[in-house]
Amino acid sequence: MTSPSSITVPDEAAAHKTLYEKGLKIRYEVAGPAYVDAALAGGSSTFARPMQELVTEACWGSVWARPGLERKQRSLLNIAMLCALNRGPELAAHVRGAVNNGASEVEIRETLLQAAIYCGMPAGIEGFKIAEKVIRTMNEEKKQ
């Protein structure tokens, strides 16, 4: 087994590249091209790019790629946490991702109800507004 201190710089660069590529694939599959492209474009400056790289590698390339939870379960967990944190734009993206991962409207609604009880009604109400708008938009997109 290799310890972190024994990894050489080329090995580290290769590991980052592998995680980034895996993460980018998962990120596109879950969040969709429009959201990912906008996030990457918004993080394309020299200052902001490292944050997008970290999100893609650590979040999507590492945690989302782990065994043990299905993508739908991860999406529902994110919905609950983002509702509790009152992170509207990210919540909207993850509601869309949950639908893309096979979550039903009922599962999303029940997740938000559960979150509302534990994180507070104002956060839950806001979460419902955001989720309903996303679901409505996605249903309209299907009709077109």
Positions of predicted regions on the chain:
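Acidic, glycine/proline-rich low-complexity segments that act as flexible tails and inter-domain linkers
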Residues: 2-72, 100, 126-144
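Short alpha-helical scaffolding segments that buttress acidic/His motifs in well-ordered protein cores
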Residues: 55-59, 76-83, 111-116
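Substrate/cofactor-recognition hotspot
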Residues: 121-125
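Alpha-helical scaffolds flanking conserved acidic
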Residues: 70-76, 105-110
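Mid-chain, well-packed structural core segment of small domains
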Residues: 83-109
